[in-house]
Regions:
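ATP-binding N-terminal substructure of ATP-dependent carboxylate-amine bond-forming enzymes
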Residues: 1-2, 6, 23-151, 155, ...
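Generic detection of intrinsically disordered/low-complexity segments and helix-coil linkers/edges
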Residues: 3, 17-18, 157, 237
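Compositionally biased, low-complexity flexible segments
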Residues: 7-8, 12-19
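Residue-level detector of intrinsically disordered/flexible regions characterized by low predicted structural confidence
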Residues: 10-11, 26-27, 33, 37, ...
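Generic alpha-helix initiation/capping and coil-helix boundary signal
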Residues: 12-15, 58, 199
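Active-site nucleotide/adenylate-binding loops and adjacent lid/helix of ATP-dependent enzymes
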Residues: 142-245
Length: 245
């Protein structure tokens, strides 16, 4: 059964959106979601794009989706998340809840993400069912795990700072010695925007992290002037577009 929360009007100040009413459903059925995206023209409808996560990135997709005549659906944890406040199609559920994610995925044509923290095992299971996942779990793992990312970039020959896998005090001591005693230490998973990152000049600086027993990524400190992000898009057919910095 579907559980509907009170309708919510989109604030008119949100760029690129029209005044609309959002209907929230729990992640246990998809009948309402399927019917709600049907076009007024019999048999025709806009493609349904499902975004797992209701944060700022999902919210920024909404105006672009409207311009492209795409029907954007959002799986949000709560109605208070950024994208959930302005989307017309919101299903409530956690990104790591198999039942919620599966129900959501079955209600859309393609699944994508607001963040990288969806379990890849769950995504592999969805792909096995025939769900289209973009990017797929084999690519998403490199956004989830910094150690996997560094290993893959190094394997491909891309320039990287010197880096070390750290699991023990001995690992960190060796990395400190090789780097000259000045490292940036990062959690392999879960860090973002300054969280899960610390500067380490001695073993004691990182003892608490080492005691957690989780793999860490140590990198040499790199002097830099600025940080740039390059956006690249790829269609399933192989066409690639790069956007100017």
């Amino acid at each position: 059964l579907l559980r509907h929360c009170p309708p919510m009007q989109v604030p008119p100040s949100v760029p690129g959106t029209r005044a609309r009413t959002a209907h929230y459903t729990s992640g246990v059925s998809t009948q309402h979601a399927r019917k709600s995206s049907t076009s007024h023209v019999e048999g025709a409808r806009s493609p349904r794009i499902g975004v797992i996560g209701g944060g700022q990135l999902a919210r920024m997709m909404i105006p672009a989706a409207i311009e492209l005549d795409l029907d954007l659906h959002v799986l949000a944890t709560t109605p208070e998340e950024s994208a959930a406040r302005v989307s017309t199609h919101v299903m409530l559920g956690r990104h790591d809840d198999p039942e919620a994610v599966t129900a959501f995925a079955r209600s859309v044509d393609v699944v994508t993400f607001d963040h990288e923290h969806v379990p890849t095992g769950l995504l592999h299971a969805l792909e096995h069912e025939g769900v289209v996942v973009r990017p797929g779990p084999n690519a998403l793992v490199y956004a989830q795990d910094k150690l996997a990312m560094r290993a893959r970039l190094s394997e491909l020959g891309h320039p990287c700072p010197r880096w070390w896998r750290v699991e023990t005090e001995a690992d960190l001591e060796a990395a400190l010695h090789e780097s000259g005693g000045d490292l940036i230490l990062k959690t392999a998973r879960g860090g973002y925007d300054g969280h899960g990152v610390m500067r380490v000049e001695a073993l004691e600086d990182a003892r608490e992290w080492l005691e957690r027993g989780q793999p860490l990524l140590a990198e040499e400190r790199v002097p830099f002037v600025r940080e740039l992000s390059a956006q690249v898009a790829r269609r399933p057919g192989g066409e690639i577009a790069t956007y100017p910095v």
